[in-house]
Amino acid sequence: MTAFHNKSVLVLGGSRGIGAAIVRRFVADGASVVFSYSGSPEAAERLAAETGSTAVQADSADRDAVISLVRDSGPLDVLVVNAGIALFGDALEQDSDAVDRLFRINIHAPYHASVEA
C-alpha cells in the first residue's frame, strides 16, 4: 500500500505534459484523481481512460468554474495547481486582456482553489 492509497487528489491542468505525469503518478500510487483541462478534450479523454481518473473541463481563468470544480470534487487530500500560462515578448507591449488572463490563471486560480479546498 502506498502513501496515497484511497486519497483524493485534484489536479488543475492535468491533461498534458507535466500535469498528465502528475495524474499518472498519483493514480499509480493508489489515489482517486480528478483533473481539469481547458483546451485539449481528446488528450483528457485518453488520459482518463488510460488511468481511471476523472477529467473535468474547467477554465482556470474562470473563478466560478475553479470554485465549483473544487466543491464538486468533494473533500480533498491533495490539491495540485499545475495550470499556468506564460506571455512572451516585451511586457509593455502585451495585450491587457492577455495579461488579465495570465493573472486569473496563474495567481487568482491557485488562491481560489486553495481557499475553497
What are these regions (language model features)?
Residues A83-F88:
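Conserved NAD(P)H cofactor-binding loop of Rossmann-fold oxidoreductase domains
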Residues S15-R16:
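Conserved glycine-rich cofactor-binding loop
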Residues S114-V115:
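A short, exposed helix-loop element centered on a Lys and neighboring polar residues
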Residues A31-E45:
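Conserved glycine-rich Rossmann-like NAD(P)H-binding loop of the short-chain dehydrogenase/reductase
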Residues D90-A91, D95-F103:
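Substrate-binding pocket helix/loop in short-chain dehydrogenase/reductase
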Residues M1-L10:
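Flexible N-terminal pre-Rossmann segment of NAD(P)-dependent oxidoreductases
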Residues Q57-S68, S96:
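The beta1-alpha1 cofactor-binding region of Rossmann-like NAD(H)/NADP(H)-dependent oxidoreductases
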